[in-house]
Structures are given as structure tokens and as C-alpha cells.
């Protein structure tokens, strides 16, 4: 398999850094054919030390750098976009413009979004009378293509979906809560559950939203990264034998199951108490009013979700993707320890 020319953003981030690790673990001979965009020159030495053959491209997404980004993108067959990808339209536009400059040579754009896009801003934090809405990416893909315009990430998703053509293949990878220790060179920390854990530790008590029955999907970062590797391998399959679907049918939800926020609150609190980080295992219940939701903001929007969940079918069916890592609940002890250390708290073993 010839090494594809890949342009990757977000290599210093959590998901992008882990995906880069997975790509080069699976294909170490690809190192010299991958270019990573770095916005911070202070990371140069760590990347050059670990990956001496990796191509480093320093730029931002400011207007002043747009032409340079487009020109660099045009040199590559495949773009994996992680950095600020879900909510930053100018970077997506620069990538599409760059790939279009390749003309008939074509290009592939694998864009990272997030399942927050499934959250309807008009739906309040109440159990729906007509039951939970399940959105899947197979029979339900038309629903994913027509989500409300005011949904999170929606403006960027719409642009990516509309940019596909015969020569420019696009796909949106839409993971839910990502957990697990990252293997990237800079950031190894996720946001939602570590943020929730830190909030509990700093508050000195367990905190739960309402009845604890709100829920969301999750996926381990290693499982997610394996999907990106499979995507790239499929994209360069010889003689057009790839099985992935693209453009309007290139919408891939990523999840390995469901968790309930009340269970997570209790698990964090119990572990923190066991380690001497909290005075009791008691969990304080917060109401549904705006003030309570603001307190819980570090956990992200899904902590108030009763209404919708994702079902990832497309990656399983077409790419043979199967999540194999441990559950989110099993990762809680590691998360509590990591956040305690970051806060300078003494852990009792």
C-alpha cells in the first residue's frame, strides 16, 4: 500500500494527537508523507524529537494565513481535520478550497464534528412525552442531514456536506463523549468527564443534575482513532474497492454505548471519597433551573439531555469498526486520580 499524502490538523490536541499516534503505529512508513499543521511553534521540538521525518507546517486560521493553508492542503490527497474543526467555518473553507485546487486529481476531506449537533436548542431539560429519539447514521441519515440550523456545529457540518463532488470526497466523523488517556504528544486529556470530575473535586461534594436519568453516548479515544485509521486505509484502497460512503452519505456517528449522568456522578463521588478527596459519598442534587445548568457547564451540554441518543451503524457495517476498549465507568478511577494530581490534591491510597 503506497503511502498517501496526508494533511492533519490538531496534532497537539487530544483527539488529533491520538489519531496521529494510531496512524503512525499502524503505518510507520507513512511518517514522511504526513504534514501536520501546528499553530504553536513551542511544540516544534517535541514533534521533531518523536517524529523526525514528519512534515511540520506552522500557521493559524487567521485571514492572513488562509492562502498559505490552502496551498499546503493542495499538496495532499487526504485531510484529517481535528483542530477547532467542529465550530470553525473558516478552517473548513480553507481546506475545501485547497483540495479543490487539486482539480481532477481529487481529494478526500475527513472532518471531525461531534454529537452535540443532535441536541435541539429548542428542547428543554425534560423527559420527552413521546419517548427518546434515536438518531442513527444508516436509515436515519436523512435526519442527520436536516438537523436544525441552530444546532451546535450545524453550520460547519452543512458546509462540509455541501462541498462534496465527484472529485472531492467528504465525510463527517461525529464522536460522542470521548474518554481515555490520549497518546498524543501534547494533550492527553479529554474535556467532558474530566471537567465534570474537576468540578466535583473543587466543589468538595458530589453534584448531580436533577434525577440523574439524563444520558449520552461515549467512545474510548483508542476506538475512535482506530476508526480514523480504517477510514484512511479504505480511502486509498486500490481499484476503488473502498467500502466507505462519502458526501451526502458520508455521515458517521461514533459511539460504543450509553451512560447515565447520575451513575457517573455517583461513580466519581464514590472514588473521590475512597481516595480521601471528598468528605462523604453523598451526592447533591441540583435542579433544572438555569443557575444549576450554569454550574454544571464544565460537563458540557449533554448533561441535561433526556431526549436523544445516537446509534452508530455506518462505521460498523461498512468499515468493520468494533469498539473493544473498556467502558467509561471503568475509566473513572483513572480520571479522578489524574484530575486530583492536576489540582495538586493529595490522594490517599
Can you say where each PLM-predicted feature lies in the sequence?
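Terminal hydrophobic/aromatic helix or amphipathic segment near a protein terminus
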Residues: 241-244, 251-310
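Conserved Rossmann-fold NAD(P)-dependent oxidoreductase catalytic core, especially the SDR/UDP-sugar
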Residues: 9, 94-158, 171
Amino acid at each position: 500500500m503506497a503511502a498517501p499524502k496526508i494533511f492533519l490538523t490538531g496534532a497537539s490536541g487530544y483527539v488529533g494527537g491520538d489519531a496521529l499516534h494510531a496512524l503512525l503505529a499502524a503505518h510507520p512508513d507513512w511518517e514522511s508523507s504526513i504534514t501536520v499543521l501546528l499553530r504553536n511553534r513551542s511544540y516544534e521540538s517535541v514533534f521533531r524529537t518523536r517524529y523526525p521525518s514528519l512534515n511540520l507546517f506552522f500557521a493559524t486560521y487567521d485571514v492572513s494565513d488562509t492562502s498559505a493553508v490552502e496551498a499546503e492542503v493542495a499538496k495532499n490527497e487526504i485531510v484529517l481535520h481535528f483542530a477547532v474543526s467542529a465550530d470553525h467555518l473558516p478552517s473548513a473553507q480553507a481546506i475545501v478550497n485547497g483540495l479543490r485546487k487539486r482539480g481532477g486529481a481529487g481529494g478526500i476531506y475527513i472532518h471531525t464534528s461531534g454529537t452535540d449537533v443532535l441536541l435541539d436548542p429548542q428542547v428543554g431539560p425534560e423527559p420527552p412525552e413521546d419517548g427518546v429519539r434515536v438518531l442513527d447514521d444508516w436509515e436515519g441519515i436523512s435526519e442527520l442531514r436536516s438537523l436544525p440550523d441552530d444546532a451546535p456545529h450545524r453550520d460547519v457540518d452543512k458546509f462540509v456536506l455541501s462541498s462534496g463532488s465527484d472529485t472531492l470526497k467528504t465525510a463527517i466523523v461525529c464522536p460522542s463523549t470521548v474518554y481515555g488517556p490520549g497518546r498524543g504528544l501534547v494533550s492527553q486529556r479529554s474535556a467532558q468527564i474530566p471537567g465534570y470530575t474537576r468540578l466535583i473535586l473543587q466543589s468538595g461534594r458530589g453534584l448531580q443534575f436533577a434525577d440523574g436519568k439524563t444520558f449520552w453516548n461515549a467512545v474510548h479515544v483508542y476506538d475512535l482513532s482506530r476508526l480514523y485509521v480504517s477510514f484512511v486505509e479504505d480511502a486509498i484502497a486500490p481499484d476503488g474497492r473502498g467500502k466507505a460512503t462519502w458526501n451526502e452519505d458520508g455521515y458517521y456517528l461514533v459511539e460504543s454505548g450509553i451512560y447515565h449522568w447520575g451513575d457517573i456522578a455517583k461513580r466519581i463521588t464514590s472514588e473521590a471519597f475512597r481516595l480521601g478527596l471528598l468528605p462523604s459519598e453523598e451526592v447533591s442534587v441540583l435542579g433544572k433551573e438555569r443557575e444549576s445548568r450554569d454550574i454544571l457547564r464544565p460537563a458540557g451540554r449533554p448533561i441535561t439531555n433526556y431526549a436523544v441518543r445516537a446509534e452508530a451503524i455506518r462505521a460498523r457495517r461498512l468499515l468493520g469498526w468494533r469498539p473493544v476498549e473498556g467502558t467509561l465507568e471503568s475509566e473513572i478511577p483513572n480520571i479522578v486520580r489524574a484530575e486530583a494530581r492536576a489540582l495538586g490534591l493529595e490522594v490517599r491510597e
